[in-house]
């Protein structure tokens, strides 16, 4: 049985979730893309949760989201082969802007479905116990930004559950690399300094996004960030896109460093709340007071 049959019984069912597929397409043509897509999604939600959702008898929200994500990711991966096949057979020709529009739509469909799926895994009791046992979820306790909403308040990620959970290891890496010590220092000096903690979280969010830009495929980025590289794509080359990605990552790192430097400056200033002067030694039981 083909991997694609994990979630789709036939092409007609597949077509319900994936727009714009050829009328004569066969599952055998999509097999290699399906293997890659299942591996990619299973790496995020774990093979155990994939199996649990796949084996559900009724059509649950989680199964619908997974079908949407799986189907659209398959087509995103196989689209280029489909177009080349049509061109070779001279049955159809697809312009570059049409190819890019289809590609973006499959990415958007996949991303939105995965966002909804991860939110469902987090909030639905049927899945949440297994989801919270995953390695990345357990790492949340070590992080300074522990929710999607909190991260989104510092750097706009379209409230993307997918992006937030994919960046858990990145946030941990940045904290272990030294930024975590600054959070500890701020709390040890004055736990009430929420302004300094907020500035450090702002810097942390920017460093996380910068690291994601250098390590993630573009389909793993929120729509707001992807849109920065999608405009006027027909007139740009792959190297142009990569340069824009690297430039944005560099800008974010520089901005984060400036914020961190400002916090370091505040922490290095002497504490003026306990000023020692001659009158500080006056005590009521002294016969002679220092004036």
Where are these regions (language model features)?
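Conserved short "hinge" loops at termini or chain/domain junctions
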Residues: 1-71, 77-205, 211-291
């Amino acid at each position: 049985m083909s991997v694609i049959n994990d979630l789709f019984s036939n092409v007609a069912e597949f077509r319900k979730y994936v727009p714009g597929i050829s009328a004569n397409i066969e599952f055998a043509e999509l097999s290699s893309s399906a293997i890659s897509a299942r591996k990619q999604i299973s790496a995020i939600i774990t093979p155990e949760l994939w199996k649990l959702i796949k084996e559900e008898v009724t059509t649950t929200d989680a199964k619908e989201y997974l079908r949407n994500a799986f189907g659209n990711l398959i087509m995103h991966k196989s689209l280029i082969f489909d177009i080349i096949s049509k061109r070779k057979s001279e049955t159809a020709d697809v312009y570059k802007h049409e190819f890019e529009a289809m590609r973006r739509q499959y990415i958007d469909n996949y991303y939105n479905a995965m966002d909804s799926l991860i939110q469902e895994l987090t909030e639905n009791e049927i899945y949440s116990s297994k989801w919270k046992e995953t390695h990345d979820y357990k790492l949340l306790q070590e992080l300074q930004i522990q929710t999607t909403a909190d991260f989104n308040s510092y750097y706009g990620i379209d409230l993307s559950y997918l992006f937030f959970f994919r960046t858990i290891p990145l946030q941990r890496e940045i904290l272990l690399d030294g930024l975590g010590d600054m959070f500890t220092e701020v709390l040890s000096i004055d736990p009430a300094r929420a302004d300094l903690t907020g500035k450090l979280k702002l810097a942390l969010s920017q460093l996380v996004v910068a690291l994601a830009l250098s390590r993630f495929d573009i389909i793993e980025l929120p729509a707001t960030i992807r849109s920065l590289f999608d405009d006027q794509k027909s007139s740009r080359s792959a190297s142009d896109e990569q340069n824009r990605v690297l430039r944005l990552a560099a800008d974010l790192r520089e901005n984060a460093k400036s914020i961190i430097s400002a916090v370091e400056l505040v922490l290095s200033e002497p504490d003026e709340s306990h000023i020692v002067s001659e009158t500080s030694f006056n005590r009521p039981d002294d016969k002679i007071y220092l004036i």
